[in-house]
Amino acid sequence: MAKYVVTSAWPYVNHVPHLGTLIGSVLSADIYARYLRLRGRQVVFVSGSDEHGTPIELEARKKGVHPKELTDQVHEYDVKMWREYRISFDNYSRTESPVHKEFVMEFMKKLEENGYIFSQEEVLPYCERDKIFLPDRFVEGTCPYCGYEKARGDQCDECGRLLHPTELKNPRCALCGSKPVYKSTRHWFIDLRRVQDRLLKWLESHGELQDSVKKYSINWVAQGLKPRSVTRDLSWGVPAPFKGAEGKTIYVWFDALLGYVSATKELFIMRRGDPEEWKSWWWDSGTRTVYFIGKDNIPFHAIILPALFLASHDPYVLPWRISATEYLMYEGQQFSKSRRIGVWIDEALEIAPADYWRWALARMRPEARDTNFTWKEFYRIVNTELNDDIGNFVNRVLSLVRSRMSGVAPEPEDLGEHQGFVERVRRAAWAVAEDLEAIRIKRATEGILEIAREGNAYLNRTQPWKLLSQDREEGVRALSAALYAVKTLAHLLAPFTPDAADRLWSMLGLAGSVHEAVWDEWLDRPLPGGARIVRVEPLFQKLPDDFLERVDEIVEDARRRAREKRPPLLRD
């Protein structure tokens, strides 16, 4: 059986993540990892806090603290947030982890020994006012490819192109806004040209890559790869291990990409004290590695990371799948901390429970194009889908069992004409499984809704409350079929709304947790006869009728309450 390493892009810890970050990588990866576990697969789910690089150093400078003071606070807070959102990481690490730093340094030394690393003088922007070189986000300017005026020195957020700081037009220091001069400094480079042919062959032949990822990456590599600097003139980061590179650090993207491996290594050290077990995953050709990222991270995961693995000469498995989402917009605009546009993940929890956000964001997941988060759509999803469709069906069935069957599930028997409904539910359930297998997360939610809506229509059509009085055996058959659908919903909701799914499992009188019920053993089974439904409570609660009228007030209040709970360095 294949093993799976599931990863989500490492969030920067310069601030609290917003909803786009949540669905773009972390939540999508969690839904998939939970699904795999429910299919009985061996899974390692890892990510971590990306603490290094210019975004962190810039934010720390603004706050007048050392970067480590900032990242310690944000990392601890993010861990708390992931716990509240029920993100089921096996290990959520950090780039300041000693295991990670040692791994990155050893990996880079291996590349140098293999002949892929060389050094040369490079001319870079330098701020005479701040007395520092300006790598990456320390310099801003106009993108030479698309004309975006706020491109960074390493990448344009508008067109996604990787950049060199000297390519920017009208450059300016991100700290003071002054125009930089250009000075020479020595840096170490990885010669990507030496892996270009192997990389292109892999990209063209690998059938599991998402079409958008594959086309984008093939086009990029076919244009010719250039050597890329792996060092920076920064003190904050993983120290560069090359002779003569004292005082320099590894470029944050090479640093963070290797975190997927180091987090796995750290996991097995923590679990079993074994510093070598990670190799049985990352060096095993039977392992499938699945990366959940935003589309702006495609070149790093589809080109740079496999290039690093190829250059190591070790038997690393190359990416099996890369699930890259488009952007989630907020009421038609891009999320922006500085302009207070959007909702951040801690603020969201002040408005509604985690399950509501998990389901709503899965429904809005930007899989093929940018999608737009609106409060009107959030309100509809919570009140109509979670409550009127799913919650209402569950409540109707369980209430009938409580009131008309003394809370005892009937014994499974020949369901007669009601077997047709059961078969439709079974087919729909396995279609949801197929969608999750293929990482069609949004379509999987549509399949779940189809079962709930079909269930409500089935109740309206068969009216088991009347049948139980007129023809009790026929009424019991109808109710048994409906109970099968409710139990099926408990299984299917587990990756999406884990708390609600577990409550429903308990209400059905089933022992243990729904998250331990492997689908291949449980999904086709009816609810066991004699199962006692001792309590019935609403699975979800509706948002208030005046929610949309008061949403601005509700959001501002949520921001205030979330800000009060944040660590001191995150309260601005």
Curated annotation (Swiss-Prot):
A motif ('HIGH' region) lies at residues 11-21. It is found in: Cytoplasm. Signal peptide: none annotated. GO terms for molecular function: ATP binding; metal ion binding; methionine-tRNA ligase activity. Its EC number is 6.1.1.10. It catalyses: tRNA(Met) + L-methionine + ATP = L-methionyl-tRNA(Met) + AMP + diphosphate. ATP binds at residue 337. Its cofactor is Zn(2+). Is required not only for elongation of protein synthesis but also for the initiation of all mRNA translation through initiator tRNA(fMet) aminoacylation. HAMAP family: Met_tRNA_synth_type1. This is Methionine--tRNA ligase. It comes from Aeropyrum pernix (strain ATCC 700893 / DSM 11879 / JCM 9820 / NBRC 100138 / K1). The gene is metG.
